[in-house]
Amino acid sequence: MAQIHVANLTFCYEGSFDPVFENVSFSVDTDWKLGFIGRNGKGKTTFLNLLLGKYSYSGSISTPALFDYFPYSISEQQMNRCASDFIDELKPGCEEWRIICELAKLDVSAELLYRPFKTLSHGERTKVLLAVLFAGENDFLLIDEPTNHLDQGSRETIKRYLKEKKGFILVSHDRDLLDACIDHVLVLNRQSIEVQSGNFSSWWENKNRRDHFAK
């Protein structure tokens, strides 16, 4: 188990005078199952991109962990190929047998890897890409809205799958998914981030209690 330490993180988009984050500090363990909670447009995706090193910032983010992000960006050229042909472009060094093991946990056949990606349903594509994501070793995973545009059956499958995993930050508007899959909450406030133990419902109950006493 390792940790991710964020210290005095400050970030502002170029041309903006209002910081997205200002002097944010916290630490999390890399085997936690974190749900990232906050209103739309308040910086969740920005923070994930900071972890991925896409933007410059002041302060520090220190960890021995390697980050990987879902959903992967699939090019038009890759859409015409089988996933087995471009797995290494998404996750270099990933072994196919590990992906096949993950697909079994997602209740789908390994045969999906050998069909043109564009012929797969949205749910099948999601499951293939999640299998690739979790087939690596020692990665800390950033999972952004994995159940978007999926039917109820696929959402339930992914909920069961993620419930057995650890070492991730999950961004989702699906409260049922968050309740089932997380053991800690990252709460995005106006310009800060706080960490609480528990799932979405326990955080919501605590928030309502604090709001009530603040009146």
Where in the sequence are the language-model features?
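ABC ATP-binding cassette signature C-motif
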Residues: 1-214
